[in-house]
């Protein structure tokens, strides 16, 4: 049992396979995984051979006393039930975003994690991005002056989701960034949805919100021919441009103001 890692993975699709790759890289121990689609877990088993152990079901992972941490890389529709069971079994829990799609379920999971003194963490990786941290420092030091407007664009061609809109899939990252930068209450004033491919799923969305006197817009799309990850901040002294896809000059401060 000592050769089994304390972290198990449930869900080995697109993001789950990426997480599995990372787990394999950072440890020499075996990783327990489970996916209801056997072909997904079989692909990882074929790739990593004896480094992967495939559980028969989720309960096998929940009841395993060796497992202390569970990563959920599953659909939002099942995250609540799986997450609740993991916390009831007193496991620390990391959930790929969005954790859930309604406030009531999220509140219940938070309450349960606190009750059992366990970690509940969402997959908001930009909170650990060095450029985002630098932007926060620039704002805090007042280099931009009074921040007046922020526009964030997150676009690419796919992957197209079947259960959630693009603002849940992509825009949730940007909401977490804004929360990190200012740590203030955000008030959504408008949400525009464009359903292009399916009637009930929004492929392109625009969220308008206020953070105090700061006006913000978050544009999300998985129907864009190129991958874009951009943040523009307009201040009373200077402007800031962050282009994550620009390898040569990601972060610029411009001597322009409004």
Ranges and model annotations:
Residues 28-29, 52, 89-91, 116-119, ...:
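A short helix->loop->beta-strand "cap" motif at the edges of active sites that frequently abuts
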């Amino acid at each position: 049992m000592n050769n089994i890692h304390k972290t198990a993975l449930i869900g080995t699709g697109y993001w789950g396979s990426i997480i599995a790759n990372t787990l394999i890289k950072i440890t020499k121990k075996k990783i327990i995984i489970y996916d209801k689609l056997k072909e997904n877990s079989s692909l990882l088993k074929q790739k990593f051979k004896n480094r992967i152990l495939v559980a028969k079901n989720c309960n096998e992972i929940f009841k395993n006393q060796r497992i202390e941490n569970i990563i959920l890389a599953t659909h939002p529709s099942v995250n609540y039930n799986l997450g609740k069971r993991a916390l009831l079994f007193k496991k620390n829990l990391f959930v790929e975003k969005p954790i859930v799609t309604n406030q009531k379920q999220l509140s219940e999971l938070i309450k349960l994690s606190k009750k059992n003194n366990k970690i509940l963490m969402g997959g908001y990786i930009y909170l650990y991005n060095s450029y985002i941290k630098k932007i926060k420092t620039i704002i805090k030091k007042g280099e931009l002056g009074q921040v007046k407007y922020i526009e964030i664009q997150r676009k690419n061609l796919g992957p197209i989701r079947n259960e959630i809109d693009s603002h849940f899939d992509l825009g949730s990252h940007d909401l977490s960034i804004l929360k990190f930068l200012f740590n203030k209450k955000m008030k959504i004033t408008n949400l525009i949805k464009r359903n292009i491919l399916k009637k009930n799923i929004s492929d392109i969305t625009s969220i308008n919100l206020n953070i105090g006197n700061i006006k913000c817009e978050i544009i999300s799309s998985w129907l864009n021919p190129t991958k874009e990850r951009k943040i523009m901040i307009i201040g009373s002294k200077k402007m800031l441009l962050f282009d994550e896809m620009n390898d040569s000059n990601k972060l610029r401060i411009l001597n322009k103001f409004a």
